[in-house]
Amino acid sequence: MRAVLLFVVSLAALRMARPEIDDTTLVTMDIKQRQLVILKLLNHVVEPLMYKDLEELGKNFKIEENTDLFTKTDVLKDFIKMRKVGFLPRGEIFTLHVDRQLKEVVTMFHMLYYAKDFTTFVKTACWMRLYLNEGMFVYALTVAVRHREDCKGIILPPPYEIYPYYFVRADVIQKAYLLKMKKGLLDLKLCDFYGIKKTDKDVFIIDENVYDKRVHLNKEDKLRYFTEDIDLNTYYFYFHVDYPFWMKDKFMDKMKMRRFELTYIMYQQILARYILERLSNGMGMIKDLSWHKTIKKGYWPWMKLHNGVEIPVRFDNYVIVRDHNRDVIRLCDEYERIIRDAIIKGFIEINGMRLELTKTDDIETLGKLIFGKIDKVDLDKTLVDSYRYLLIVMKAALGLNTFHSDKYFVVPSILDQYQTALRDPVFYMLQKRIIDLVHLFKLRLPSYTKEDLYFPGVKIDNVVVDKLVTYFDDYLMDMTNAVYLTEDEIKKTKSDMVFMVRKRRLNHQPFKVTLDILSDKSVDCVVRVFLGPKKDNLNRLIDINRNRLNFVELDTFLYKLNTGKNTIVRNSYDMHNLVKDRMMTRDFMKKVESITDMRDLMIKDLRNYHTGFPTRLLLPKGFVGGMHMMLYVIVTPLRLVDNVDINILDINRKDLMRDFRSTVLLDKMPLGFPFDRRIDVGNFFTPNMKFVEVTIFHKRMTCDMKTRWNRWVLKDYDMVDRTRIESDSYFVDTDLDMKVNRNVNLIDV
C-alpha cells in the first residue's frame, strides 16, 4: 500500500513538473515555452512523437475542418488536393531536387507560414509530425520558424543533431548501434580497436578518424577536415533556410531584398575560403568543370541514411555524360548558353518582357536567372518557367541520382542535400563554373575609379596583427538521435544511453587586428578587412587581378571616426557575424527550462546562432614553417541605404536583421567591394587602404586529439604497425598499413 501511495505521489509530482500543453496554454505561451515546443518536435524525428501532449494536439486537429484558421484558404485547398493524391511516405529520403517533392514541401511551408496564430501553427506542426515524411517536416518547420514573425527569437537545434546521418560516417553510427544492442557491454580490447570510450554517466564516445585510410580515394581527401566540418555545412544549410531559392520576394522583408547578390557573395566567399585551404595543403587552384571530360577525383561519402539507403560513391575518372542523363546535360548547356548570351548582349527577353543586365543593381536579375527563377510579379505574366534553377539542373547532371519530375523514390547524391553538398570536391568545381557567369557580368561593368575608392581626409596609418597560429582540436558531437529508442525510453522521453562522436577540427589561437586611422573630420565609415594568398602552390607571386577573387572577407563593420587618430582593436572572436561552438540541444533544453528570461541567454550565448560563420574557420591551416598571406584593409565613407536611420538601428539585433552580412547591406556599395570588379592598378591604391603581409603558422600537436584516452595505437595487437603516419596525421590505427602480405594466392590456400 505504501509503495502504491509513493507511486501515485511521484506521478502527480511529475505531472506538476511538466504541465501538459492544451489550447489554453498554447494561447498564453511565452518565448520560453514556444522554444521548448519546437525543441520537442525536432527530437528523434525518425521515430514516433514521444511527447503525449503534442501527440494529442496533432491527433485532435482536423485540418479540413479549420479553414478559417489560415490566412490563405487557397493554400489549404492545394494542400488537401495534394494529400488526396499522396505525399512522400514516411521513411523515404526527401530532396528538394525532385520536382514533386519540392512542390509538396513548399505547400507544407505555406500551411505553417499562413497559420493565423501560434496556436494554429503548433497544431499544424504536430499534425505534420505525426503523418507526413520526417525529412519534409523538418525542412518545412525549419524554414517556417525562420520566417514567421511570432517565431522570432526561437533557436533551432543544429541540423547535425536533428539528423546526424548527414554528418557522421556510417561506420561510426554502426558502432553506436552495436553499443545499443549490447547495452554498452563490449570487450575492452574491441572498444580500443573501435575507438570507443565510456564515461561514468553512460555517455559513449566514438572516434571518427578523419584520416582513416579506408575512406581515402585521392589527395582531395586531405581537405576532409574542412569540407566535412559540421559548422561549415551548418552555415551553408542555414543560409539556404533563410534565402531558399524557391521562395518569392514577398516573403522577404526589405532588409533582404539583395538576396541574390548575397547568395552570389556567399558562394564566392566559400569558394575563396576553400582555395585558401587548398593552398595550405600544397594543392593548386580548382580545375575547370567540363561536361565532356571525366572528373578525375572521386569522393566516397561513407554515409548511410536512416532507412538503409547509402549515398553513392563517385570513383576517380568518373564519366559525366551517360545514356540516362544526356538530356539533362543538354539542358545545362542550353540554360548556360542563354544566360551567357544575355550577359554579353546586356539584356534578356522572357515572354516578351525585356530585363536589363547592364547596371550594378541588375545583379539581382542575374542572380534570379542562376540561383532562383523570375517571379510572375516581375513580368506580369501567368507562366514564367524559363531558365529556372540552373544550379539544381547542374547538380542533377553531376550527381549519381536520376533527375526526376514525376517519381517519389530516389537515391540522393551528396550534392542533393544542403547539409552535405560542401563535402564533395566537385561542388567547388561546379560553383566555380556558376560564379564565372557572374564574373562575366562584373567584367562588363567599369573598374572602380579613384573617386569610388578614395576617402578624402582619411588615412590608414598602421595595421598590426598578432601572431596567427592554427591547430587541430577535438569536438564531441551528440549523435544520439541516430540511434533508435526502446519502448521504455519512449515512455520516459529520454534515451538511457548518450552517444557522442569525436571529430577532429581546425581551430586557431585568438588574435587581434589593430588599426590606426587618421581622420580630419568626424564621419561614419565602413571598415573592410580581407585575407588572401600571396603566392600559389608553386611559390609564384599571383597577379592582383587573378588573385582578387581569392580574398576572404574576415571582418566588416561600421565605425564613427573622430577627428585625429583613431585606434580600432578587433578581436578575432568579436569579428562580424561569427558564431562560436553551438550548445548541445540537451544542455540547451535544460538551460531554457531553468531560466526565467530568454533575452539574456540570446544576447550572451546565442548571438549569430543561425547566421554566423564558424569562428574556428576564420583562418586557413597555413604551414608549420609559416604561410605568407596578404591582409587588406580599406576604410570608405558610409553610403547609407535609403529608409534607414543609422542613429536608431542596432545591427546586432539579429531578431530584426537575419542576413549574413547585415553591416555591408547597410552600405550601397556592391558586396565584395572593392575586389568584385577588375582592378585598374593605376587608380587602385589610395591612402585609405593598406596591404600588410602576415604569416599563418600551423602548430602540429604531438597528439592532436587533446582529450584522447590513454592509448590509441593498439599495443596489444601485433599486426599493427606502430609507426607514425607523416604529414598532417596523428596516432591512429594503421590497420591497412600493417606488415602483412595481402597478395594471397587462393590456390595456395
From Swiss-Prot:
UniProt keywords, alphabetically: Signal, Storage protein
Signal peptide coordinates: 1-14
GO MF annotation list: nutrient reservoir activity
UniProt note on tissues of expression: Fat body, and hemolymph of larvae.
Record bears the keyword Membrane: no
SUPFAM superfamilies for this protein: Di-copper centre-containing domain, E set domains, Hemocyanin, N-terminal domain
InterPro entries for this protein: Di-copper_centre_dom_sf, Hemocyanin/hexamerin, Hemocyanin/hexamerin_mid_dom, Hemocyanin_C, Hemocyanin_C_sf, Hemocyanin_N, Hemocyanin_N_sf, Ig_E-set
Conditions for induction: Suppressed by juvenile hormone.
Isomerase as UniProt keyword: no
Homology family: Belongs to the hemocyanin family.
Protein name: Basic juvenile hormone-suppressible protein 2
Organism: Trichoplusia ni
Encoding gene per record: BJSP-2
